[in-house]
Amino acid sequence: MDLSDIRNNNNDTAAVATGGGARQLVDASLSIVPRSTPPEDSTLATTSSTATATTTKRSTKDRHTKVDGRGRRIRMPALCAARVFQLTRELGHKSDGETIEWLLQQAEPAIVAATGTGTIPANFSTLSVSLRSSGSTLSAPPSKSVPLYGALGLTHHQYDEQGGGGVFAAHTSPLLGFHHQLQHHQNQNQNQDPVETIPEGENFSRKRYRSVDLSKENDDRKQNENKSLKESETSGPTAAPMWAVAPPSRSGAGNTFWMLPVPTTAGNQMESSSNNNTAAGHRAPPMWPFVNSAGGGAGGGGGAATHFMAGTGFSFPMDQYRGSPLQLGSFLAQPQPTQNLGLSMPDSNLGMLAALNSAYSRGGNANANAEQANNAVEHQEKQQQSDHDDDSREENSNSSE
């Protein structure tokens, strides 16, 4: 084999090798190679990155919490809502709306002072009340506070947050005409225990308040009002005891009578006697007759008995008065407790006026009885005078014989 043949064989092998390599390059370009990240995953990654970017921005809605109100839902800051939740647990309320109602009742004086209007209790549907607080704090009075509502103890409380609790100002409100003792409420507030607080660096919602029983407060308020009413009744002026004296029958005064004051000694005796009668458990007779002296026939009144009002059982010296047997009615036997009803006179005098009215309402019957009694007395006196004349005549005749 010569040298030319060897060269031809080498060229053929090179051509084959070259051709095979070219086919491999073509096949490699035409082959499909899978990619490491599909296009869908890249799109999801892009959207997730934008979502994380948007979550970093907090909207204003996240800072508010919905709390159930009275018939509707209201919005308030989260710190206020947290405080409302805590108060609901501490006060034992059934819902947060009840706690909000309690807070509005406590703030009623401040609402009236700020708006100039308000109802007692507050009308939540029409009253424009915004539970927004400056400085993200909600000031509330302590649980053991002065009773609720102005005329029923309506007071205004101011709680000092910076001082740690303990400064309260009670101002009574004369909205409905009730008069309360301001000094008594102030002393009561000053004697109350201060509110326990956590140091200022911690959350406001962790302040602790004592639980309150509103029913006990209402009972205490009613007892205090009853005591004040009793004190005002007992401190009122008492009516002086008076005697009703009828005029002589022939004086022409008609049914006129006089009211004479009882002397001091007689008044003391009357009080002691009335106390004894009350203690003994029996009532004195409503009418006491006082008979005039027997020797007063020439005075014209005769020995007629005059009836006086008597709440006691002692004899009153009235011999110098000659009265007609005018029945003045059944007066009060025992002095009734004085109850002022806003009139210029106590009610103890009203019983006397009622008795006089009933006496005069009988009209002609009382006058007829009085005239009959007067006629009987005059007839008796005439008989006595005639008997006396007959006796004197007989004596004169006997002496002449």
Swiss-Prot record:
Composition bias, Polar residues: 1-13
Q: Where in the cell is it found?
A: Nucleus
One GO MF annotation is: transcription cis-regulatory region binding
GO cellular component terms given for this protein: nucleus
Q: In its UniProt record, which GO terms are filed under biological process? A: regulation of DNA-templated transcription
Which residue spans adopt a coiled-coil conformation according to this UniProt entry? 364-389
TCP domain: from which residue to which, for each copy?
60-114
Membrane-spanning segments: none
Q: Keywords for this entry?
A: Coiled coil, DNA-binding, Nucleus, Transcription, Transcription regulation
The record's annotation in PANTHER family points to:
TRANSCRIPTION FACTOR TCP4-RELATED, TRANSCRIPTION FACTOR TCP8
Oligomer and partners: Interacts with PP438/PNM1. Interacts with SPL.
- What is the annotated role of this protein in its UniProt record? Can specifically bind site II elements in the promoter region of PP438/PNM1.
Under what name is this protein listed? Transcription factor TCP8
Q: Which organism is it from?
A: Arabidopsis thaliana
